[in-house]
Amino acid sequence: MSNSTPLPSSFDGDTDFYEENRWQKLTRRLKEEPLIPLGCILTSLALVGASRSIRAGDHNRTQRMFRARIYAQGFTLLAMVAGSMYWDSDRKKRKEFEGVLAETKAKEKNEAWIRELEARDEEEKEMRRARDERRRRAEGRPAPKAVVTDAPAEEGEKPKGGVMEQMSGLVWGKK
């Protein structure tokens, strides 16, 4: 093969498997639902305030901080529920898009695999022809005048596209 680009291999890693990295996903989620991190921060601040008041021995402040923690957690839960209701249709569309994207990538990978198999088959045929030619030369026999390897069954019939199509014809009895 004179092509300088290597053939795609079925053993290659799928480099486009992840569309967005973790940092991009985190920033997207923070932009979509900014109230959830706010609720988490408020809960953490209430817990820090409660632990400081426990160390100081202020029971009234400790009780207020624990109540603030409960309110902050309730706020966080409400933000989560409201955000999930608001972004539900967007998530469904995103999942549908990712499904279509995965399907097209699987088709492309399958087509690349078939092209690779066909190219390997052609290379094997070339190697077989060269080996037969060397064998004939070594034995001193002349080469046959007309060697047809991929001739159609009838003159009016055109050869099919590739190995997989020919094999499917054999399997399903359409030869």
Swiss-Prot record:
Provide the topology term for how it sits in the membrane: Multi-pass membrane protein
Give the domain of life.
Eukaryota
Chief subcellular location:
mitochondrion
**Coiled coil regions in record:** 106-139
Limits of the HIG1 domain? 7-98
Region (Disordered) residue ranges read: 118-175
GO biological process, any:
mitochondrial respirasome assembly
Q: Where is the composition biased (Basic and acidic residues)?
A: 125-142
Self-association state and partner proteins as the record states: Associates with the respiratory chain complex III/complex IV supercomplex.
Its function, per the record, reads: Cytochrome c oxidase subunit which plays a role in assembly of respiratory supercomplexes.
Give the family this protein belongs to, as stated in its UniProt record: Belongs to the RCF1 family.
Q: What is this protein called?
A: Respiratory supercomplex factor 1, mitochondrial
